Amino acid sequence: MDIKYVSTRGDKEKVTASQAILSGIAPDGGLYVPETFPKLDKSLEELKGLNYREIAYEVMKLFLTDFTKEELKACIDSAYDSKFDTEEIVPMKEADGLTYLELFHGPTLAFKDMALSILPYLMVTSAKKNNLKEKIIILTATSGDTGKAALTGFADVEGTGIIVFYPKDGVSPFQRQQMVTEKGKNTSVVAIEGNFDDAQNGVKAIFSDKELAAELKEKGYVFSSANSINIGRLVPQIVYYVYAYVKMIEEGKLNLGDLLDVCVPTGNFGNILAASFAKELGLPLGKLICASNTNKVLFDFFKTGTYDRDREFTLTISPSMDILISSNLERLIYRLCDCDAAKNAKFMSELVNEGRYTIDRTMAGKLTDFEAGFATEEDTLNTIKEVFDKTGYVIDTHTAVAAFVANEYRNKNTSHNKILIASTASPFKFAGSVLTALEYDKVDGFTSEWDKIRELERISGKKLPETARDIENAKVIHKDICAKDEMKALVKEKILK
């Protein structure tokens, strides 16, 4: 089946996968979605025994239909190699009745590596397929993890440049150090005075500026995105849910056809949307449990049908989820509207102009695949300690949000489905908060982030990977700070300097 992509907001033009990857976002500001949805063309039985790269090919070929077999396999083999610290790519661990899918074994210790390791190869291949002559400028907003993963993926990739914006006070010390020490000659990192939503809105505004796009194209540049608004980010994330299910069958933890519930710590809605797409492919997933922190805009949406961004924004110990405008939810809303782009566009307009929208009863009735919960800061810290005390397994703050919500769901329901937790980051990325959970009386004695990491190594018996250890004494290269309304001018300056 030849899959074409359409905008969630009604742009009539149908584009290929490679064109959608290059554009990042549709000309009308919508997000690209498959016009028709494929199904797995191999049975789960046939997928048994395949490694991660092989399953990645079987899943991604269904969506990226204008890539040849050779092109797609080359992208996959280049992405999922020795830069991951385990041959499995995504190992699974059992702890206290839950199965943790460890998505943090890539170079930047976060799940974003799963997609951002392959996106540069997909993009360069797409550029060749479409005879693109211009240099691709990747614009990315980050709440912490996407930034470094994108920088690592695109560093010194020929024909590309990348500019990352992050909230000055909204990332962990480790995340900041990862970004500001990036050595790639085609990279720029900028702190903005604002939160992640300000950074994301600024990037979207730049993408939507047709005058700026025309000016830069004339000078040989085009924009694209490494955020999960890019379909090239979303498709690789579907893979690990299929892989996890197949491995659980192989290990006797599931019988073929058993429903598997999935609980995902959620900010921008991309990771859980990928699980939804996996279910649509035919994977036997049960409930998709959306886990929020105290910025619980998604929890409230699933409970009330109203998405309301007009609320207090809180900086939490799970900063990658500190988001009030969850971009990928638009792709779900579009499907709830029966792909009525005009209806979806109206909701998105209401969100911009009024700060909220409410879906109708028919749409709300289609949300039965989803459950939602949230964890307070206290819940998050207590969960880290409880899991460690019971099992010796250390989880990070975002994963702890999901574990708390999964346990809450399990205790309230009679379902006997196994629950898979998307474990999205290494605990070393948030060592201070994890230590606070494990050793209340000692954490204040460690003045540097690296002392905290060494203490966490001692407690957990795990070692920080060498690739991450290198940044401790690395030189800070990127020192730019700008106001949120200065982003466009700064982008022009950096590109045309």
Where are these regions (language model features)?
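PLP-dependent amino-acid enzyme catalytic core
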Residues: 1-497
